């Protein structure tokens, strides 16, 4: 007997190029089922995935993201569509009982397909962003069932001009498909245009009645004390008789330690005509003071489990549906002060600091594990919004699930871009896809797929463009707000809000319209190049209230370059000086192919890497690039935060990550190693933040929370390269109001007598009563007209450190707590926030000339001491985790979650860190946690 429910078909798939298969789909699923053998052309398939992903998995082609290997892979424009038309085949078992019904579900296929089940053919219509459900009840076998699909690429894969370009020749825009696949200024072309069964395939077994696309909506009254849950679901009766059934809804809240409380249980009786469909709306369910869902930085992400079941008389449970749901309300208007779009969550304004997202992987190798890491990384950076760019995907439910979990609001665009749809060079087609009804069908289906996620904040018609007029008008109508979400009132005359397609979120026609950029669609987003850090704070930097795209550099660490390129890609750029004194960087061919963006902008910005001296090699270049990365992105967010609500309502960085091994605009690379910009962003976007305005040199406190800060003070200390503290000051603050920026006082050290050319500044915001640090911010600065070249000899300083590490292993996961203490001393006034390490951990063993270790096996505790006779700042320290067993050149274990990284410690200061990661499968030795820094060029082990 088949159990009621869903079975995912994600293993056992094989594939072959259609031109190399001599039999048809009927034969494949009856008399001639294929198998992998030395004589056949069949291979293990990546499902979900793409043709290119399958070929890479089987090493039939090189890794397109390594070096220049993509140039060795045949492009569909040269081969024709048949070359990337593939058969996919698998077997499944499903024994059903009388009055059970079985459906075969495809959550997405690119671009069209014919499906064969046990010799029966079904034509699947076109479109990359639509679901397909096939009733296979009457064609199933009691034992093994054979399933084959022939999947065809997009109808208009286009060609790639020699110069590349934004979306190639723009032909892909004639289809309802992802547009980035023809290449952009940040990615190479994807040779198969993402052809494949790229999302979940499943078999679902139900009784006579099945549940289709429930819609959950919450409304609030009395200042969020009273709430109602509105639910509408479509019910389909597959049987040939009128069916009486009960529809049950259960709402469960998790209290703690896995203990759950059923908050509501409601049953309603319905009659469904034979082979008919009805839309059933539940009586609204009342809640008193529900636990609200909040975005990252505003509160907890409280979720309730909503379970809907349908029980058919004389049959039993027929179907069930479950969805985590967050009670929250999103409002969005154009702000009267700034002209920017303002968002409110549960009545509170939220200052948007987020970034643009393309997709997790350019070959659509999507997984829950990768999505979890991607989204947690964004939360770790203290971001609160992700924009799903219109040239990419309608993101998957797993993406949204983790945005729900970690509190990331999502701006979801439909599949229109200015470059491809009317504003490109050469001028592209302004009429969008050829089939407008197909576009709208995919859009409506996407809304139904995603609308129950609390993280989903708004729909947008396109990137830097609006959809064609008829599509745009249809979307405006389909996605119109229910009256409650416009007037805040719910009348008995109003229809239930859950009967709308959405009705709860705004639809904005394009990314530069209606409160974004100049609001009129002119190209007023950007810029996308390196900037002087102080410029981000200037009132003249950006005119408008909300910038949907502003970007900069994105160089990863040297280990990533070596892991993703052969040795000829390890050469650093040439620095060519022009007649105007500006430096032009000339990268090698591989870096250019991987879309490297230079750290100079001749005529505007002097090379920021050369501010630290000419790099000697790849390691030196990448380390200095990380220094620039940290400053650049911290300044970007701090500059916007400095004018919160007075000039700006939000900003989204272009872009957060790369779906391939690109070298442009990223906080972490495709291998999932964070750059220093990740931690610069994390610092700048913390909910309560102390910062230095780099334009005015005023110390500021940014309070984005709803709570007033009182009984707080700021400690400012300057440290020179000799380890002295020539400046120390405590600023007493009476209060910092909620949702406000408070300018405290001018930082006057640069105007003092004989200030140092290069110096360090440490700011700490703390509560006076208990000295608890609320915000810590460390700067390295130079006087006007100077640079950071004095930091080069500072590398020779031997600053002593003491590192204490305590590790806990749960399954394959390691959870480490590490304390790093700069044990050097300097003459300074008493540090009111200074933390001292007081543990005495016994016998030491010498490991290196500067490093000694002790361990307590009973407590899982390890202590490492780095010897040093110099006093000063331990500068720009970085953790990394390594596999001691691997023979690969790249020994890193990735991903790793660090509570902070790329940090510096002043004399006498200590900081604690949390490090979390999963050990690789089969690894027997303990992983090694390493530490290195500006003063510690040779990384040393602190654990393992």
Curated annotation (Swiss-Prot):
Regarding how it is modified after translation, the entry says: The mature enzyme is proteotically cleaved into 3 subunits of 31 kDa, 28 kDa and 42 kDa.
Function of the molecule = Glycosidase that specifically hydrolyzes the Man-beta-1,4-GlcNAc linkage in the trimannosyl core structure of N-glycans. Does not hydrolyzes pyridylamino derivatives sugar chains containing Man-alpha-1,3-Man-beta or Xylose-beta-1,2-Man-beta.
Q: According to its UniProt record, which protein family does this protein belong to?
A: Belongs to the glycosyl hydrolase 2 family.
What is this protein's name? Mannosylglycoprotein endo-beta-mannosidase
GO CC aspect terms: plant-type vacuole
Record text on subunit structure and interactions: Heterotrimer of 31 kDa, 28 kDa and 42 kDa subunits.
InterPro entries xref list: Beta-gal/glucu_dom_sf, Beta-mannosidase-like_N2, EBDG/EBM, Galactose-bd-like_sf, Glyco_hydro_2_AS, Glyco_hydro_2_cat, Glyco_hydro_2_Ig-like, Glycoside_hydrolase_SF
Please name the SUPFAM superfamilies in this protein's record: (Trans)glycosidases, beta-Galactosidase/glucuronidase domain, Galactose-binding domain-like
Name the UniProt key words of this record, in alphabetical order. Glycosidase, Hydrolase
Q: Which domain of life is it from?
A: Eukaryota
Task: Tell me the active site.
Answer: 464, 549
Give the Gene Ontology MF terms in alphabetical order.
mannosylglycoprotein endo-beta-mannosidase activity
Entry-linked PROSITE patterns: GLYCOSYL_HYDROL_F2_2
Substrates-to-products reaction catalysed: Hydrolysis of the alpha-D-mannosyl-(1->6)-beta-D-mannosyl-(1->4)-N-acetyl-beta-D-glucosaminyl-(1->4)-N-acetyl-beta-D-glucosaminyl sequence of glycoprotein to alpha-D-mannosyl-(1->6)-D-mannose and N-acetyl-beta-D-glucosaminyl-(1->4)-N-acetyl-beta-D-glucosaminyl sequences
Which class of enzymes does this protein belong to?
Answer: hydrolase
A Pfam short name: Ig_GlcNase
UniProt note: pH dependence: Optimum pH is 5.0.
An example GO BP is: carbohydrate metabolic process
Quote the EC number.
3.2.1.152
């Amino acid at each position: 007997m088949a159990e009621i429910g869903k079975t995912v078909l994600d293993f056992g798939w094989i594939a072959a190029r259609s031109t190399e298969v001599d039999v048809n789909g009927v034969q494949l699923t009856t008399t001639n089922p294929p198998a992998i053998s030395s004589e056949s052309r069949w291979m293990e398939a990546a499902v979900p995935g793409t043709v290119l992903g399958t070929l890479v998995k089987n090493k039939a082609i090189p890794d397109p993201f390594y070096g220049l290997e993509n140039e060795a892979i045949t492009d569909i424009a040269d081969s024709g569509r048949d070359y990337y038309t593939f058969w996919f085949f698998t077997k499944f078992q499903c024994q059903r009982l009388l009055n059970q019904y079985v459906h075969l579900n495809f959550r997405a296929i690119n671009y069209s397909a014919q499906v064969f089940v046990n010799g029966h053919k079904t034509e699947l219509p076109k479109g990359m962003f639509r679901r397909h459900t096939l009733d296979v009840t009457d064609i199933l076998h009691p034992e093994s069932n054979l399933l084959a699909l022939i999947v065809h690429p997009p109808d208009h894969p286009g060609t790639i001009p020699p110069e590349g370009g934004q979306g190639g020749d723009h032909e892909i825009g004639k289809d309802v498909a992802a547009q980035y696949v023809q290449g952009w200024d940040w990615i190479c072309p994807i040779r198969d245009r993402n052809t494949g069964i790229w999302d979940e395939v499943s078999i679902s077994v139900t009784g006579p009645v099945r549940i289709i696309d429930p819609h959950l909506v919450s409304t609030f009254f009395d200042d969020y004390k009273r709430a109602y849950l509105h639910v509408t679901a479509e019910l389909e009766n597959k049987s040939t008789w009128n069916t009486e059934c009960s529809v049950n809804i259960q709402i469960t809240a998790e209290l703690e330690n896995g203990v759950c409380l059923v908050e509501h249980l409601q049953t309603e009786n319905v009659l469904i005509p034979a082979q008919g469909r009805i839309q059933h709306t539940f009586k609204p369910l009342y809640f008193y003071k529900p636990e609200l869902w909040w975005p990252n930085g505003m509160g907890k992400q409280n979720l309730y489990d909503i379970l809907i079941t349908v029980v058919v008389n004389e049959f039993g449970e027929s179907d069930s549906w479950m969805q985590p749901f967050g009670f929250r309300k999103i409002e969005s208007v154009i702000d009267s002060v700034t002209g920017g779009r303002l968002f409110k969550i549960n009545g509170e304004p939220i200052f948007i600091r987020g970034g643009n997202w393309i997709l997790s992987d350019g070959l659509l190798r999507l997984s829950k594990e990768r999505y979890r890491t991607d989204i947690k990384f964004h939360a770790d950076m203290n971001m609160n919004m992700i924009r799903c760019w219109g040239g990419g995907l309608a993101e998957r439910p797993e993406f949204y699930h983790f945005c729900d979990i970690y509190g990331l609001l999502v701006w979801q665009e439909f599949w229109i871009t200015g470059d491809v749809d009317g504003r490109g060079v050469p001028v592209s087609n302004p009429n969008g896809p050829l089939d407008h009804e197909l576009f709208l069908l995919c859009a409506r289906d996407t809304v139904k797929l995603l609308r129950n996620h609390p993280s989903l904040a708004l729909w947008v018609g396109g990137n830097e463009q609006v959809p064609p007029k008829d599509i745009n008008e249809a979307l405006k109508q389909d996605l119109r707000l229910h009256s409650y979400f416009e007037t805040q009132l719910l009348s008995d005359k109003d229809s239930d809000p859950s009967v709308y397609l959405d009705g709860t979120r705004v639809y904005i026609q394009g990314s530069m319209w209606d409160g974004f950029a100049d609001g009129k669609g002119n190209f007023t987003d950007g810029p996308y190049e390196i900037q002087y850090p102080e410029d981000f704070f200037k009132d003249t930097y950006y005119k408008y209230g909300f910038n949907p795209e502003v970007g900069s550099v994105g160089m990863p660490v040297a280990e990533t370059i070596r892991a993703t390129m052969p040795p000829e890609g390890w050469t650093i750029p040439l620095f060519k000086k022009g007649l105007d004194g500006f430096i032009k960087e000339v990268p090698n061919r591989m870096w250019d192919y991987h879309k490297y963006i230079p750290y100079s902008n001749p005529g505007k910005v002097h090379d920021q890497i050369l501010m630290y001296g000419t790099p000697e090699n790849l390691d030196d270049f990448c380390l200095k690039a990380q220094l620039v990365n940290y400053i650049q992105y911290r300044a970007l967010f701090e500059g916007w935060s400095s004018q919160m609500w007075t000039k700006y309502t939000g900003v989204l960085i272009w872009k957060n990550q790369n779906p391939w091994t690109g070298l442009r605009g990223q906080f972490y690379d495709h291998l999932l190693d964070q750059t220093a910009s990740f931690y610069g962003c994390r610092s700048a976007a913390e909910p309560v933040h102390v910062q230095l305005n780099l334009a005015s040199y005023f110390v500021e406190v940014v309070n984005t929370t709803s709570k007033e800060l009182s009984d707080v003070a700021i400690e400012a200390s300057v440290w020179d390269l000799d380890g002295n503290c020539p400046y120390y000051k405590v600023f007493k603050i009476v209060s910092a109001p909620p949702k406000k920026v408070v300018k405290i006082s001018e930082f006057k050290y640069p105007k003092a007598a004989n200030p140092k050319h290069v110096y360090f500044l440490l700011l700490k915001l703390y509560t006076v009563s208990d000295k608890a640090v609320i915000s810590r911010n460390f700067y390295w600065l130079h006087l006007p007209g100077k640079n950071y070249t004095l930091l080069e000899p500072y590398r020779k300083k031997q600053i002593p450190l003491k590192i204490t590490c305590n590790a806990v292993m749960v399954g394959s996961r390691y959870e480490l707590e590490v304390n790093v203490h700069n044990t050097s001393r300097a003459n300074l006034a008493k540090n009111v926030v200074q933390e001292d390490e007081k543990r005495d951990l016994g016998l030491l063993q010498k490991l290196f000339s500067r490093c000694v270790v002790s361990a307590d096996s009973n407590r899982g505790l390890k202590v490492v001491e780095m010897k040093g006779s110099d006093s000063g700042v331990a500068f720009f320290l970085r953790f990394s985790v390594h596999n001691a067993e691997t023979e690969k050149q790249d020994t890193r274990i990735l991903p790793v979650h660090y509570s902070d990284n790329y940090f510096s410690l002043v004399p006498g200061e200590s900081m604690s860190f949390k490090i979390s990661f999963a050990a690789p499968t089969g690894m027997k030795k303990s992983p090694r946690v390493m530490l290195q820094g500006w003063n510690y060029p040779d990384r040393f082990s602190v654990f393992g």
